[in-house]
Amino acid sequence: MAEALPPRSPPDDVDIDPDFGPQSRPRSCTWPLQRLDSQGSPGKPNSGAGEAADTSSMIPEEEDDDYEGAASTATVLGTAGDKGTLVLLSGGESGQLAVLASPVGGVETLQVSLGGEGAGGAVSGAGGQQQQRKCSSRRNAWGNMSYADLITRAIESTQDKRLTLSQIYDWMVRSVPYFKDKGDSNSSAGWKNSIRHNLSLHSRFIRVQNEGSGKSSWWMINPEGGKGGKAPRRRAVSMDNSNKYTKSRGRAAKKKASLQASSDATDDSPSQLSKWPGSPTSRSSDKLDTWTDFRSRTNSNASTISGRLSPIPATTELDDVQDDDSPLSPMLYNSPGSLSPSISKPCTVEMPRITDMAETMNLNDGLPENLMDDLLDDISLTSSQQSSPGVLMQRSSSFTYGTKGSGIGSPSNNFNNTGSFNFPLTSLRQSPMQTIQENKQATFSSMNHYSNQSLQDLLNTDTLSHSDVLMTQSDPLMSQASTAVTAQNSRRNIILRNDPMMSFAAQPNQGGNLVNQNSLHQQQSLNSFQGGSRALSNNLSNTGLNDSSILESTKHQQQSSVSHSMQTISDTLSGSLYSSGVTLPTLGHEKFPTDLDLDIFNGSLECDMETIIRNDLMDADGLDFNFDTLISAQNVSLSVGSFTGAKQTSSQSWVPG
């Protein structure tokens, strides 16, 4: 296309390519669309060259700007008379442009016909002379110069070698003919955006803060000489092209391997608990402190101190463990005497804690009788201080209450001279069973540690409901029976209810266990109480009533007669016999001191506690126990610390069974 310019000096000494005619392109952006007349020159087009240009090669896409091999040059090709024409073109490999000065009108007519790669350009003047040239296809609509080249020339054309963004826009519109008619806001959006991108992405341009306030920054050429062309295009970070995730996966694998190695190394230590697979403490040592804080809650389905999901004995796992390697699992004793009430220290906080946990455990699934038989055969409670710390409370087939440190007893029914008291446990009938496995040694304290007020608190509190089974360390101190009472009864339906809590007092320095297990009894006749030469001791009063209403219920039960004859029980109860309306008299301190000197009992004392508990306490039809007199007389009670439950007297009537 030929373009006539007024005869004036070129701005900034930059040659402008007059060949801005429409080009054949597969797409259109801000570049001119393809027209039928490919030669948009105001002069007469060359039809032959136009035909060639109409089907000539497409303008290729803008290549990467790392093309520094072909230096762009701007050359003033010539003038005709006092008229001049600026031609801006790229100095390609064989690019040649012949300018024929026209003698007519002083205006040069420049026509370039672009063919394929290496096609010659025919330049025709007014005289029709033509000259061919070889050149490559143009990279852009305004020529082969890129935006970066134009920006560079714009900045270098100034005296201060710096321009603002708006000044660069003005230079483009003023110096490059292609942008002359694209200076308005509607048509300048595309190329101005390209200018901004090139300024930001090219390392050859730097931005300098303008000293004036509220003014745009200066754009300058990088004095350090940035690399030519655009910077590599940045890609969005993904899991495919980023090594961040690879590094994180590697760190995680290394950490896991180190933890595994440390865990394997600590397994060899006898103090580690990883050999206990059922214990939550079978972890690495760095996590041991955290887990032991709440292991008793997380390892039980009832949120109690029980370390197992059910009272089913787990002797298979524990038999292989040495006694000195006792775990921190709450189902085992920590030490022979640790945290256990002793003679010198009253039990102040143990009782409420156990009672609270007793309420939380409620196994409502009925268990078959044969399963309960197996369970009870494995239960063993011993107060021996010589027992190993790892002894489970579920081992033997009898409860042993010893005053001389007796060991695990056999299921016998005799009460020997040493004061040990053995009675068999029979199966519980299919009923909701609740159990507590205490993790401390269960011992008894002497009677003088407790006061009447604390016993009243125990009787008035409702924390021990009649449906709870309690295995506790409290000392309601029912004295050891010294009568010779035997009965013919099968090993079934022993009922240790927690409402009349039965406990057995040993000597002040000895220990025993109190077991209250709630199970519904099966009605079975008891033949008779036989024999009897000794007395039930003076502390039958403290049967551990949980509800104050038991006093009324026992009085209510006296209206029916005792179905089985009871023989002489004691010669120390002031001649009182167990019969209808028997009231236990107040005993003098001179004969039965509060420390229960058991040496006053002579001979062999035999007692079938199953019969006593079953018949006298649970089915006592005609017994009237007067507890108030003995409580005041003996000053025997429990010191239970501070119960968590509210102290209120229940008015409900307790009915056994």
UniProtKB/Swiss-Prot annotation:
InterPro entries: Fork_head_dom (IPR001766), FOXO-TAD (IPR032067), FOXO_KIX-bd (IPR032068), TF_fork_head_CS_2 (IPR030456), WH-like_DNA-bd_sf (IPR036388), WH_DNA-bd_sf (IPR036390). SMART domains: FH. Transcriptional activator that recognizes and binds to the DNA sequence 5'-[AG]TAAA[TC]A-3' and regulates different processes, such as apoptosis and autophagy. Acts as a positive regulator of autophagy in skeletal muscle: in starved cells, enters the nucleus following dephosphorylation and binds the promoters of autophagy genes, thereby activating their expression, resulting in proteolysis of skeletal muscle proteins. Triggers apoptosis in the absence of survival factors, including neuronal cell death upon oxidative stress. Keywords: Activator, Apoptosis, Cytoplasm, DNA-binding, Nucleus, Phosphoprotein, Transcription, Transcription regulation. It comes from the Eukaryota. The lineage of its organism: Eukaryota, Metazoa, Chordata, Craniata, Vertebrata. One of its GO terms (molecular function) is protein kinase binding. It comes from Xenopus laevis. This is Forkhead box protein O3.
